[in-house]
């Protein structure tokens, strides 16, 4: 089961060389326009990067598995004296904003920096995600989120008038398969959603042992014993819960897979 991973840490490590390159290019193109307040240097000479740090990352949700993310970079650099009569330098730091995008379905191999500008401390998103790539939901916006969820899977009738959403119909609309199995011997696990095909262990009542079975991706397993011992409402709620889990945590799972390709499920609080 996957633990929550940090997108900021991943970006900081994987794209470090990209950020150094864009920082160097930014200084090259903008050094004359920066308000640097030089104290030792009489004339700007060679610019030497000393450090480039990812200070903060803001992620914006896009359709499918795509994301857009803004990265605040701090750039430490030396400005060497350009007048050969002097031999001195000034140490300076600036912040810039780097706007990036990529597709998690491609493991961000299509990563692109499409804009670089001065950092102004402001960043607003209509579809923010947290550092684990889980959509940020606000209490005063839950109705709108529910409506958007129903629209994504073409349950338009529920938007016209209140109606019950059949769990099996929702799962089918989402391309998910529901199976009743014995997840454990004691029924302690009610349901589980598999994002990726994998081999897992299920309880076999005949042999009274755990047996291995390959579970396809996009499968929801519901524990047969737990379902039998509870009411239909809890069963339906479990299926709906796993469907929502699939929808809202696909990108969090994709991030976890960037750290560990063996993962097939994602644990959430």
Language-model segments: what does each one mean?
Residues 1-269:
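Short juxta-domain linker segments that transition from a proline/glycine-rich
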